[in-house]
Amino acid sequence: RICYNHLGTKPPTTETCQEDSCYKNIWTFDNIIRRGCGCFTPRGDMPGPYCCESDKCNL
């Protein structure tokens, strides 16, 4: 899977991932959008990520 992995509004960059999904999430403590490989369960009051299963789907 190819996922975007840039922070916030930086120019898009990608990485090739072992996982079959990508995620995008806004972290509550700094309001920065993070992107990357896989999908995860948030801790505490952090909102859940947007997860998707196609190449470059997490822009």
From Swiss-Prot:
Disulphide bond pairs: 3-22, 17-37, 39-51, 52-57
CDD domains hit by this protein: TFP_snake_toxin (cd00206)
Effect of residue 44 to C: This mutation promotes selective inhibition of beta-3 integrin; it provokes 1.8-fold loss of ability to inhibit ADP-induced platelet aggregation, 6-fold loss of ability to inhibit A375 cell adhesion to fibrinogen and 330-fold loss of ability to inhibit K562 cell adhesion to fibrinogen
Main location: secreted
Cellular component GO terms held in the UniProt record: extracellular region
Listed result of changing residue 43 to K: This mutation alters integrin binding selectivity
Family as reported in the entry's similarity comment: Belongs to the three-finger toxin family. Short-chain subfamily. Antiplatelet toxin sub-subfamily.
Protein name: Dendroaspin
Species name: Dendroaspis jamesoni kaimosae
Lineage: Eukaryota, Metazoa, Chordata, Craniata, Vertebrata
